[in-house]
């Protein structure tokens, strides 16, 4: 059995740490677990005092108090040093909250993927949206409990010894600041230099490494105010697995790239049209912009190029419309080497909004309810709550 420690990474947010530790305390553990509380130097001792007094009921507790301020990037990366002692480590920043079964999941994933060097790490977190476009992210569902994504995760993750050592070798060569690169998400490139995650994401994309991601999240993020958050937000909250689940089917057959695009579409177009992967830009979320200059471009944008194929925006997730050849005029495969008149589909933006954000309710009904509520609120403001 692999040894797996849990590390709570802290700075100056005592209440955040207390919330994280409450979720860890309520979780299920099949074996004694070492809890590491790693605290970066700040101008308060409240976090250190809380950590010292905290009683960990599930195994050994170790409190690390850094005497100098490392900063977020150096602090997070230093956690990897614990892999000299443990086979794997669950890394949790203090604004994370874990599901009761997170350790069972981590344990089984480590046993399954520890020798797979194509896997860079294990995510506890499942994105509810594409991090680059902020549109809903719906992965294709299979009989597996996990899928693969060529993008590192920071809102609950597991690092394994051999995979981490390989990343560290890469990082030691690529640790210098970098600007916008065409093969990386623009937003990631523009993150501040205090970000460690931008380097791990770059590593996954450039070295063709994947994170294992659950279909149902084992962690969620409160996005508390801190180094990279200037206001409280809820978009990082995701559906959290409840109850005690002890067994996972860990046979991923679906892979997404670092831009949240389905990699199976490369194989589809290779089989159907003979288009090679190196010639194709899959850009359904619109985050790539074909900055690599690929000849074929799959996108929802209406562009002045020859349309090779077009598809509907009906099945979910949207890549199924392509895989099942559902004809329509919402998704276009262009040959950018041939200029042509732009497609004229003026209602496509509205259709996309309805497709992405509506429920079974008609959009007009939703708008009608909003208008009526506004009128009622205005009436109450003028005449009082009890006015008929």
Language-model regions, residue ranges each:
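Peripheral/terminal regions associated with large enzymatic or DNA-binding modules
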Residues: 1-92, 96-388
């Amino acid at each position: 059995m692999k040894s797996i420690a849990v590390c709570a990474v802290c700075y100056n947010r005592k209440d955040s740490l207390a919330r994280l530790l409450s979720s860890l305390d309520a979780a299920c553990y099949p074996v004694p677990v070492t809890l590491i509380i790693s605290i970066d130097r700040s101008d308060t001792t409240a976090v250190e005092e809380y950590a010292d007094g905290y009683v960990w009921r599930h195994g050994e507790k170790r409190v690390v108090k850094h005497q100098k301020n490392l900063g977020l990037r150096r602090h997070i990366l230093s956690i990897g040093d614990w892999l000299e002692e443990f086979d794997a480590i669950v890394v949790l920043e203090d604004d994370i909250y874990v599901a009761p079964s997170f350790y069972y999941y981590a344990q089984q994933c480590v046993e399954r993927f520890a020798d797979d060097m194509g896997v860079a790490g294990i995510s506890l977190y499942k994105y509810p949206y594409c991090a680059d476009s902020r549109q809903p992210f719906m992965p294709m569902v299979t009989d597996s409990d996990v899928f693969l994504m060529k993008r590192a995760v920071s809102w609950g993750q597991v690092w394994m010894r051999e995979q981490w050592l390989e990343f560290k070798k890469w990082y030691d060569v690529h640790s210098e600041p970098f600007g916008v690169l065409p093969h990386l998400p623009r937003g990631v490139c523009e993150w501040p230099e205090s970000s460690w995650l931008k380097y791990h994401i770059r590593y996954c994309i450039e070295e063709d490494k994947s994170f294992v991601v659950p279909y149902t999240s084992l962690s969620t993020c409160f996005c508390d105010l801190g180094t990279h958050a200037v206001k409280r937000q809820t978009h990082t909250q995701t559906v959290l697995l409840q109850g005690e689940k002890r067994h996972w089917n860990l046979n991923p057959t679906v892979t997404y790239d670092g831009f949240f695009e389905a990699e199976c579409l490369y194989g589809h177009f290779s089989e159907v049209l003979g288009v090679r992967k190196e010639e194709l830009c899959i850009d359904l979320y619109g985050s790539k912009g074909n900055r690599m200059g690929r000849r074929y471009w799959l996108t929802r944008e209406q562009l002045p190029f020859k349309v090779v194929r077009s598809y509907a925006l009906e099945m979910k997730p949207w890549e199924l419309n392509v895989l099942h050849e559902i004809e329509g005029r919402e998704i276009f495969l262009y040959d950018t080497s041939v200029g042509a008149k732009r497609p004229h589909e003026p209602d496509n933006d509205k259709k996309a909004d309805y497709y992405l954000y509506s429920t079974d309710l008609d959009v007009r009904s939703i708008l009608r309810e909003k208008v009526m509520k506004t009128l009622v609120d205005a009436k109450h403001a003028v005449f009082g709550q009890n006015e008929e």
